[in-house]
Regions:
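Bacterial Sec-dependent N-terminal signal peptides
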Residues: 1-26
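Generic N-terminal amphipathic/basic segments
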Residues: 7, 23-31, 89-94
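Single-residue recognition of alpha-helix boundary sites
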Residues: 13-15, 71, 247, 317
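Outer-membrane beta-barrel porins/channels
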Residues: 21-35, 40, 109-368
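Outer-membrane beta-barrel translocator/receptor signature
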Residues: 38, 50-59, 65-144, 224
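Short amphipathic alpha-helices and their capping/turn segments at secondary-structure boundaries
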Residues: 62-63, 234
Length: 368
């Protein structure tokens, strides 16, 4: 008969593994794109010693001292992206064109006179989108030669089955170092013991199995920075500035993966043995990272002669407070002509959050 199993794990990360995965995921959301005003992007971001542009508020705050008058500006970015997904049986192309405000800012300048040592004093605020995480994809494989469950079984080998089972006062997600996917798959009967050893496992795909697979993923989110800068012009030779950056980060990823198999090796509960039958399973995997950061920037520009400018800036590490949440849901249906049987295991674990600190280049700011 047909059996349905629903198993849910929220933030199913063992304590020892949470930090490592978070570091990897953090790297994937580290700002790495060249964004800003059209002038800034056209110059490849080489404005450390040039100044006089709204984008320099987040690069070298001394650039604000170059301003002779107040300015308001905004930059619109058209992001034209095409995603192509190919499998042995099909190819899918998708367009994901969007409009963004990459930069909005204001600089106010007070001219104090050409005879004063401090010729002018400027202040400014700006908003900049440092990164945008917009990706989507879909794929289908009409003829598979394996199963994700067999892969899970391969890296679960060596783990004692008792460590994967739930007990009255035992939760393997938090009380063991087992991989969360191993725990999820084992308790959903997607992987099962080989019948001989307590630490050897096999998946649903057997010698006679045929099937197909499908997946869909979507990423969204951003890293935005808000800058507040102050700077001045000393004798038209030395320009200085200090800036305070506040960052807002949000990253979301949704992944759906499913398999449908005939003549799969399915495990029956009453007989506790493996028989051939039809198996369909799907996993929804979600991840959310959100938080804020703060940094301080110091900058100078030296102009000894009219045609030469030398600039330098120091950025403090960016201190982040990040909340990392994740969850996975598995639906597993299988059919065999044996005796009636049913099971409905269900687990729910609380969400978890973590804080990280790093600099803008090597930030512990958790893609698979």
């Amino acid at each position: 008969m047909k059996i349905r199993i629903l198993l849910t794990a929220m933030a199913a990360l063992a304590a020892a593994g949470a930090t490592a995965q978070s570091a990897v995921d953090a790297y994937s959301v580290t700002p790495s794109e060249l964004r800003g005003t059209a002038r800034f992007v056209g110059m490849g971001g080489a404005f450390t010693s040039v100044g006089g542009d709204l984008s320099t508020l987040g690069q070298n705050p001394a650039g604000i001292g170059i301003y002779r008058r107040s300015e308001v500006g905004a930059t619109v970015n058209i992001s034209a992206r095409n995603y192509s997904t190919a499998t042995p049986t099909m190819k899918i192309d998708r367009d994901n064109t969007k409009f963004y405000f990459d930069n909005i800012g204001y600089v106010g300048t007070a001219n104090l006179g050409n005879n004063a040592t401090l010729r002018s004093f400027s202040w400014g605020v700006s908003y900049s989108r440092l990164s945008s995480f917009e990706r989507l994809g879909h794929g289908y494989n009409g003829t598979t030669d394996g199963s994700m469950t067999n892969y899970i079984a391969s890296f679960t080998n060596g783990t004692n089955a008792a460590d994967l089972r739930f007990g009255e006062k035992y939760n393997p997600y938090f009380d063991s170092d087992c991989d969360w996917m191993s725990i999820l798959a084992y308790n959903a009967y997607m992987i099962n013991g080989d019948g001989v050893y307590n630490d050897k496992y096999k998946g649903l795909y057997g010698n006679n199995t045929v099937g197909d697979a499908e997946y869909t993923f979507r990423e969204s989110g951003h890293v935005d920075e808000y800058n507040i800068d102050f700077g001045g012009n000393i004798s038209d030779v030395f320009y200085w500035g200090i800036g305070f950056g506040i960052l807002d980060m949000e990253y979301n990823r949704q992944v759906y993966y499913s398999e449908s198999m005939d003549k799969a090796d399915i495990y029956t509960l009453p007989s506790q043995r493996t028989v051939e039958g039809s198996a369909d399973w799907a996993m929804n995997n979600s991840k959310w990272i959100s938080g804020t950061g703060f940094n301080v920037k110091f900058g100078v520009i030296f102009r000894p002669i009219e045609m030469l400018r030398i600039g330098a800036a120091i950025h403090t590490p960016t201190w982040y407070s990040l909340n990392h949440q994740g969850g996975a849901t598995v639906n597993y249906d299988y059919y065999n002509p044996g005796a009636p049987e049913s099971t409905n295991p269900d687990t729910q674990n609380p969400l978890k959050g973590n804080d990280y600190t790093g600099d803008e280049n090597n930030m512990l700011y958790s893609y698979d």
